[in-house]
């Protein structure tokens, strides 16, 4: 595969994943730690309606000096509920994600982007053979990127989960795949930080590869996928260029392809999570 072509494709998608951010974003602090960035309107709304939040000198913060993780979680739940009632948070999931690393609190998944809180996700490149990937098409009812192609497995790391636990859960839900039946290889990670209609998407995505034996039957279990298909790497690269994959899954796929091709010097984008300082913002 043409190395120059791959590099240019990664650079083009990287520009979409990490564009310049709006200068008016307000840093959001929990327990004195910068955990997110919110639009000024969101910061004002919460500070005016929920006791325990302040907006002062350009910093949006939880007034939480004496609070433990449960109390902070309760305050964030109150704020998220107020935002939901006002129509400023939609797509409620009743799923809790961690705030900060190590965790300082938990928050409803749907509210993360309103606060610009960094989330973590795991994605799996499923190889049928060295030149063929198994991919999944997102269901039409999905809130984000309906109908686009995706990695076979991909999803958020829930509060209290390890990366491996999240990957195993998502593999079972999305493909009926028992992770202990395949050999999983850890790839690199990357971070997306971009404005979205819901606020700010700040997400660290961890990449994994696995070879899927022909004997394994793959079937979606949670209704969030409407097709599973096999595509050659050449077909996948063409689909990425045509915008047929989600941005996240395109970058996940290219991480694997470039790594396997020995292209490991893509600066300031793909990184080794275990040795990196990029664990939050």
Which residues make up each language-model segment?
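N-terminal leader/linker segments that precede catalytic domains of diphosphate-processing enzymes
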Residues: 1-148, 156-169, 177-216, 233, ...
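Surface-exposed, charge/polar-rich loops and edge strands
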Residues: 153
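NUDIX/MutT-family hydrolases
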Residues: 219-247
